[in-house]
Amino acid sequence: MCIRDSCQSLEDLAEISDILVSVLPGGAETDNLINANVLKKLGPSGVFINVGRGNSVDDEALIEALRSGAVRAAGLDVYKSEPQIPDAYQTLENVILLPHIGSATVETRRAMGNLVFDNIRAFLEHDTLVSEVM
C-alpha cells in the first residue's frame, strides 16, 4: 500500500506506476528483484525501463510478461550477461534494446576521463588511487 509518496513494497510501487524505471545497483540483494510479481502489478499498460544493472531483472519473467501482454513494453540498456542479449528479447516488437549507452553524456564521459587522470597522477605520485580495483 502506498500512502502519499511512501510505498511499503516494490509491488505496491509498481501497482500505482505507469512506468517503472530501474536504476538499481548490482549485487546479491538486487538479484531478480524485478520479478513476475512486480511485473504483474505493473500491469498490461505498464512500461518497464532498466538502466541500472542486468542482474536485477528476472529475464524469463520479463520475456513472458512481454509476450503475454502482462506488461506493455520494455526499454533495456543493461543485461545480465553483457554483451550477450537473450535471443527472446530480440524477437519481441515491444522491446527497445540499447547497447549500454545510458551514461553516454558529455558530463559523464568528462568525469570518467578526469577519474583516469586522477588515478594516473595518484599512482605516479605513490598516493592512494581514487578508485582502486582489487
Question: PLM ranges: what are they?
Answer:
Residues 2-3, 40, 93, 118:
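Generic cytosolic/nucleocytoplasmic N-terminal low-complexity/intrinsically disordered segments
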